[in-house]
């Protein structure tokens, strides 16, 4: 499911994410964003798609990003820095598509996300997490259109791959690739992951190292 990646990138990704990753900032509004520093990659997705679990699995720190069984709990942009010299920062974005949230709250989150996407020069890529059990939903497609409009590079990451039969996952990957052909800002490579088993994490880490190389 996941593309073959240069072993050197895999190893460099392993070393980078084996270092000390830590929380540095929480921004409830665009006015409270931290100073731009290094390269930023953000994680977006529907509420309870597994963003926090994926960040924890990436960094090997079970409690780095707070996980919650309450959809829509993350209402801020959460920033994490890596070890000295990593040059990489992770951003956990508010979950979207939570039907029980008030209209005012949804409007506030939407405004924050849009402003962040359009005005952050250090933002290199957004990883859009899609639940591998369900595939793309209308609300996901809306976010992809927003990213296209903002001209922000993004890449699809299918989560919870361990909870889907192989044949179903293959169908989900094919359907997602077909849908992405209509989106100009989408990075063509699709990743499949499992935070529980660690599947796909080496490839995702390597993808970020490749981004760092491209920006240097």
Swiss-Prot record:
This is Probable GTP-binding protein EngB. One of its GO terms (biological process) is division septum assembly. Its cofactor is Mg(2+). Keywords: Cell cycle, Cell division, GTP-binding, Magnesium, Metal-binding, Nucleotide-binding, Septation. InterPro entries: G_ENGB_dom, GTP-bd, GTP-bd_ribosome_bio_YsxC, P-loop_NTPase. NCBIfam families: GTPase_YsxC (TIGR03598). It holds the Pfam family MMR_HSR1. The keyword Metal-binding applies. GTP binds at residues 45-52, 72-76, 92-95, 159-162, 193-195. It comes from Rhodopseudomonas palustris (strain HaA2). The keyword Chaperone does not apply. Transmembrane segments: none annotated.
């Amino acid at each position: 499911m996941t593309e073959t990646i240069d072993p050197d990138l895999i190893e460099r990704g392993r070393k980078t994410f084996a270092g000390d990753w830590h929380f540095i900032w929480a921004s409830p509004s665009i006015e409270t964003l931290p100073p731009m520093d290094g390269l930023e990659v953000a994680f977006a997705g529907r509420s309870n798609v597994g963003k926090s679990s994926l960040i924890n699995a990436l960094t090997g720190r079970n409690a780095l990003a707070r996980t919650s069984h309450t959809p829509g709990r993350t209402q801020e942009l959460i920033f994490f820095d890596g070890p000295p010299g990593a040059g990489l920062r992770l951003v956990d974005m508010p979950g979207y598509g939570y039907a029980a949230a008030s209209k005012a709250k949804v409007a506030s989150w939407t405004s924050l996300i849009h402003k962040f996407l359009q005005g952050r020069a250090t933002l290199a890529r957004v990883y859009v997490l899609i639940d591998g059990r369900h595939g793309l939903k209308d609300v996901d497609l809306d976010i992809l259109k927003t990213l296209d409009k903002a001209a922000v590079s993004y890449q699809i990451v299918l989560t919870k791959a361990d909870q889907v039969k192989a044949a179903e996952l293959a169908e989900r990957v094919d359907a997602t690739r077909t849908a992405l052909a209509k989106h100009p800002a989408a990075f063509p490579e699709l990743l499949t992951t499992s935070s529980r088993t660690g599947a796909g994490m080496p490839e995702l880490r390597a993808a970020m190292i490749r981004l760092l190389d491209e920006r240097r």
